[in-house]
Amino acid sequence: RINDKYGEYGHCRVYQESGMLINTLKFAENVGHGICIQVSQGADTDSYGATAGSLLGAYFGPGYLEERWLEPFNDDIHSGMAWFFERSLSNLALRMGELPGKITPQLA
């Protein structure tokens, strides 16, 4: 229905893709399932697939992400960002998990 309302379907259509993301968040059974739902809907699959994975990972927690999603990385992350020297995916995940407590101490 959202594509009918806005009359366009394609890459980088924020209303449509936000609607698809809401659809994913509503029906995902776990992180991997949600990534598959999001990417299967088409459009900007890499960006919104990553967004869905991030949001669902925060919601479900690490226990709901199957090893098959992490194994290809060999605990190594590469980034084109200047001055970003973190290479361990697991260390980066731990640091990101600590952020809410640093921003709002009562969440720790």
Question: Where are the model-predicted features located?
Answer:
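Acidic/polar loop patches that form or flank catalytic/metal-binding clefts of enzymes
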Residues: 32-35, 49, 65-67
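Generic structural signal for well-ordered, non-membrane alpha-helical segments
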Residues: 14, 18, 31, 45-48, ...
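Acidic, carboxylate-rich catalytic segments that either coordinate divalent cations
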Residues: 1-11, 59-108
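Short glycine/serine- and small hydrophobic-enriched flexible loop segments
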Residues: 23-27, 55-60, 98
